[in-house]
């Protein structure tokens, strides 16, 4: 049998734990994983890929954008990061030397995760033909803001054979407003007909 003083101690501990839990929840709301917190947000802040970032910046400055890009390389070298920076810069309303301004509505909506013009698909977990068909449906929609709808497909080598074939038709005849940026660690797993339609970095 618990004594009254023991019950009071238990209640005090529970109250303290509740306050600590509340505090922890408030702290966690503002918590950002280091990889995201320190992920480069401009071409200038990308380390070790100057030859690629300068080429992409030149394409934006000159308005010479391809309809499909493939970024290849080992994990952690910045493929997806460069794809996101490029996607943002493509639709920036006031680009400066190929860099996104980070101030226009298009840049702000991208930075806040509410851009309607940039679509990301993680093919590691969304690799079926239905996932690609859903993406193809989005490709048909004209961009609401900016000139292009940009589709970033990460780990593209993970797509099923049927998904690759479904995607190929769109890649062969893309609408003028669509740009695809594919990223992979295993280029050799991508079918040659896809490779032949991409600028490869």
Residue ranges: model-predicted function:
Residues 1, 10-11, 27:
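Short hydrophobic transmembrane-like helices used for membrane targeting/insertion
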Residues 5-8, 12-15:
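Cationic, amphipathic, low-complexity segments that mediate targeting or membrane/lipid association
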Residues 6-7, 19-201:
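P-loop/Walker A NTP-binding region and its immediately flanking N-terminal helices
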């Amino acid at each position: 049998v618990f004594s009254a003083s023991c019950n009071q101690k238990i209640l005090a501990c529970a109250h303290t734990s509740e306050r600590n839990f509340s505090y922890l929840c408030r702290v966690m709301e503002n918590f950002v994983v280091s990889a995201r917190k320190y992920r480069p947000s401009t071409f200038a802040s990308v380390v070790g890929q100057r030859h690629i970032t300068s080429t992409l910046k030149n394409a934006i400055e000159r308005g010479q954008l391809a309809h499909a890009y493939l970024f290849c390389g080992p994990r952690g070298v910045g493929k997806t990061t460069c794809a996101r920076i490029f996607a943002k810069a493509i639709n920036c309303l006031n680009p400066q030397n190929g860099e996104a301004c980070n101030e226009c509505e298009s840049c702000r909506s991208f930075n806040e995760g509410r851009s309607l013009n940039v679509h990301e698909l993680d093919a590691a977990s969304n690799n079926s033909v239905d996932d690609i068909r859903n993406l193809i449906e989005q490709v048909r929609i004209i961009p609401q803001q900016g000139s292009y709808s940009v589709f970033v497909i990460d780990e593209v080598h993970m797509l099923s054979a049927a998904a690759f074939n479904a995607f190929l038709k769109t890649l062969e005849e893309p609408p003028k407003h669509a740009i695809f940026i594919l990223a992979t660690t295993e280029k050799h797993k991508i079918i040659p007909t896809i490779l032949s339609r991409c600028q490869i970095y």
